[in-house]
Amino acid sequence: MTDGTQRRSVGSLPEPNAASSRVPAALTRFVWAMWLGTLAVVAGFVRTDPAWAVDGLVAIDGLTVVMWSVVTFFSGIVHSYSRRYLDGNPNKTQFFVRIFAFTIVVMVVVAADHIALFAAAWLAMGLLMAELIGHVDGWPQARAAARSARRYFVGGSLLVAFSLTLLWSATGATSVTGILDAVGGLSTTTALLAAGGLVVAAMIQSALIPFHTWVLSSMTAPTPASALMHAGFVNAGGVLLVRFAPVVTVEPTVMLAIVAIGAASALGGKLLKSVQPDIKGQLGCSTVGQMGFMLMQAGLGFFPAAIAHLILHGFYKAYQFLSSGGAVEHTTPQSVSDHTVGFNGVGSIIVTLATGLLGGALFAVLTGKGTLANGGILLTFFVTFATLHAARSAVKHTTLPATLRYGAVPLVFFPAIIVYGAAYEAISFLLADLPVVTATTELTLLHGAIAVVFVGTYLAIETGVHEESGRLYVALLNLSQPVADTLLTTTEDYNEY
């Protein structure tokens, strides 16, 4: 270097404290033990269908045991990964205490029956996630990201508290179960206001448009925290709607609005992802889109499908974040394979269409959805559409010879649909004790319009129509920008962390 620029050198790693170094290992083992315990709880629940509750305080039902097993499993993975990832970090013990506390709080959220306990746990969940986002407190950008997220989460918590207070004042019940039992007596105004507050709170939690900025500004979080956020924290929006399904299903207008909101975020997330230059930004926008799909399923009244979606998405996104380092490589560009032919030719089209249509039919047979003129048709349609998209991507990008490619696509996707259908049926069975498991919605012209707009916009994106507009590109780029104070633009800022 001849320009006189001084670069700070990276100092030696701090010596780990013997006592504190035992905390991460102990908490990791304890979380895995908790997961084994939750599996025993699930088994006991299936065998005896017990009424486990502390009257007016907590109530353990099918949703509780499902989410307990999922949350502790994801948390165990994150704990195990973090032991290696944070080696040498002076705040390693603090990080482990936070993710363990976060795990416990989420478990309280899905078990809480008293409305005050539910609201307090919901707030604590958001505050702990904000602390994880700002874990590297030596970065001004991390502190700014934590402040931004905290504002969103507190706002969502206030909406939850507002809805619960409104429901308490209307029903006189201080427990969630008591409120849900009395939903039938709510006035239209009360039902709309309470449901509206819960829906917006779910949108904030799940980072749906226009509340997606917090998740795109959270890239300062350590990778394990990002995995926990995208695989678990954002899912709480769906859990909120499932828990209070009797409230949000009272008015058909609310359910239709949920479908429209979900469709907008599903498409918006895909558009925003198309302009992201980095892997974490792409994963963040992918989460926005996937949570939109999850909300659509809830809006159609298929709450087990929403839970199945968020669980499977959690597995996928945890893997993607924890392996994101593998996407950053310096390699010599390779010549394009002769077998990378793209999506052209009659064979590609036939295989893609056949896989999508047969996949949708397989889902309908496995679940019984799509055989009647109700929201099940749209659910099956979106499953078919998702299968078409996945099959098209596989046919387009694979480097296998044509014969193997066309034969492998259905062999890969049909088992995946069977897994999804089996997960849907298993979760439906476990959620059978909830007040509302499935709220069949009658199809309307608006549902049809949403489907048409969804397909049209998707096709426009896939064919690259949106890339021809410079204004649209700039608009998408602006819409996907994180808060300015959260951007890490100087590599020297990383040196001491």
Q: Which role fits each region the language model picked out?
A:
Residues 2-477, 481-497:
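...captures the hydrophobic TM-helix bundle architecture rather than a specific catalytic motif
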